[in-house]
Amino acid sequence: MRPDVTAESAAGLPQRWLCVSLHDVAPATWPSCQKVLDAVREVADVPLTLLIVPAYHGQCSAQPEFERAISAQLAAGHELALHGYFHVDPQVPSDFVDWLRRRIYTAGEGEFCGLSEDEARERLTLGARWFAANGWPMAGFVAPAWLLGAGAWRALRAQDKWQYTSTLTKMIVLPEAYAIDAPCLTYSVRSAWRRPTSIVWNRLLSRVAQGSQILRLGLHPHDAESRPVRRSWQRLLERALSHRKAATKAEFVRQWRARSVRHGERRSVSPVLQSLP
């Protein structure tokens, strides 16, 4: 499978894009991830960005069977991106707002929210080495729960290996830190009340975001287990594909750069924005 993408529509207008990503990919979650991939293929055979965690909740992902499975996904046309290192955030929140963000918005998994620059640099480097050892190309880094704190942001900007990162609402083109509005449809399935709430919210957000240049669908390992949730995002995926071109995040960034060079469509973003989801 290869992404069939173009920078502009036949009418000469900017192409509208859809980027589908699968978060939290690791040996412990891989069986559930495969179910999500199967559910995506029920709708369409599109390229995904798989967000890989090197040591998910402390469990090393450098396992031959898992690495072979991920290499097969790469060969099938999917992109691999680094997604944190441990995917856990054991640090104590600094205040009530920080507690809400790191313990309620996400269940203690915002690993890169409170790291110092040195800590973040070390984890980014270790993750990059694991990718290199497997011969996996690496263009992007996405912080767990999209929570990228000030120290992690500085570490990311200081390394020249990254082409993009993303928050909950933006795609950030690196190293310049150009920001692109990129609404993300994503589901929370941790509890019974979150599932129907997510379904309603994403239905509304998909309508609001119809005119956006890029729409993202951020899936997680358990998003195929609840039939109502699965059918919700499958319908939204099908609807989006009727007027958007599917591409990996790296391919979108490449196409965006090519177009922005021709048309001067670049905007800068303040580093402060990157500490927010």
Task: Report the location of each language-model feature.
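Active-site beta->alpha N-cap acidic-glycine motif
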Residues: 2-79
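Catalytic domains of cell-wall/extracellular-matrix polysaccharide-remodeling enzymes
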Residues: 113-185, 225, 230
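Alpha-helical membrane-targeting segments
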Residues: 3-4, 95-104, 178-211, 228-231, ...
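C-terminal domain-boundary segment and adjacent tail
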Residues: 2, 10-13, 44, 48-49, ...
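Metal-dependent polysaccharide deacetylase catalytic core of the NodB/CE4 family, i.e.
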Residues: 51-150, 217
